[in-house]
Amino acid sequence: AAGVDMAMKPDDSGVLESAKMADCEISACAVSAADAIREALDKAQRPVIMLGHGVSDKAVRDQLFTLARQWKIPVITSVLEMSALPWDDPLNFGCIGGAYGHRYANMIANAKSDLLICLGISLCTRQIGTKVHEFAKNAKIIRVDIDKYNLQRNIHESGNNEMKFCADAAEVIRALAENAESAESDGSTVYDFSEWLAVCADIKKSLRAVDDSTPERYPNRMIADLTDALADTSAVAVDVGQH
């Protein structure tokens, strides 16, 4: 990670001004991002952690997952991070993607959540669709990314209800973990979104990853059967695209 990063500066109303970025030390950016996430969690009822390949260190991911388990927050990943959590992990709600993502992931992130905590994930059009401003219209979005150019584009129209921090996501996660330890030691707020996690589990159960309800869906059933037949150590090579 770079030694110095830049964070988007919110105006007095708390809405981020996407055209303005200020120099700051990475640790300061990380603390600012962690504080913003905690403040947003204080008000949220349906938060989701959106995890991308920008958080590729296993130790850092495990630190994040420890927090997610403590706070009962569902995790949705990019396609590159699909293996970050075991498939049957109670926190795992699949990968985002309009065409190739899981239906329950798209439903939870796009239509049901009120807070998206986006860590090292680009939110490109392959992930959220070409109608960018329609994505998660009712949710506050907090984006942490090391790529300042990726943060120059808004997800919400005019950047409303959206905060951006150009920082190392690993530093932000560590800052969150330290913040959580301090909160527990002094008896401050400890989050519990277990009711929301249960709602997400119901959505996942209803919108199965494999839809074999009609004969036209047989290819889905075939792939599922093939998966069941393969050993856990099997390697499968596939081409790209909507195959």
What function would you assign to each model-found segment?
Residues 48, 114-117, 237:
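Conserved beta-strand elements of the Class I
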Residues 23-36, 96-101, 217, 240-242:
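A general structural motif
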Residues 22-28, 87-100, 156-170:
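Short beta-strand elements at the ligand-binding edges of bilobed clamshell
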Residues 33-48, 67, 108-112, 225-232:
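Glycine-rich phosphate/diphosphate-binding loops that line cofactor/substrate pockets in enzymes
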